Amino acid sequence: MSQKSVVLHLYRSLVRESKKFSSYNFREYSLRRVSVGFRENKNKDQNETKELIQDALKNLEMVKRQAFINSMYSTNKLVVE
């Protein structure tokens, strides 16, 4: 896979997992961090991109765990939802 397709796959995976948060605040924060983080790093060189991909993979696993934990302890919906 080319680096561009790996990055795109990571972005989509992070967005998909971020949408699984049951809490509105966590969900919106996570989606915002994903989009801002990818936008900030879109013009990095290949060596930096490889390191950022490794960081994003770790973050993806963290988001998966946190979304699961958040769904286990869900609360009532907020008014904004």
Swiss-Prot record:
The cellular location(s) given in this protein's UniProt record come to:
Mitochondrion; Nucleus
Keyword Mitochondrion on entry:
yes
Q: Which InterPro entries match?
A: Complex1_LYR_dom, Complex1_LYR_LYRM4, ISC_assembly_LYR
Establish whether keyword Transcription is in the entry: no
Q: Which domain of life is it from?
A: Eukaryota
> Any one Gene Ontology biological process term?
iron-sulfur cluster assembly
Q: In which pathway does it act?
A: Cofactor biosynthesis; iron-sulfur cluster biosynthesis
Where the protein is mainly located, per its record? mitochondrion
The record's listing under Pfam families reads: Complex1_LYR
Protein family per UniProt: Belongs to the complex I LYR family.
Q: What does this protein do?
A: Required for nuclear and mitochondrial iron-sulfur protein biosynthesis.
The protein's name in its UniProt record:
LYR motif-containing protein 4
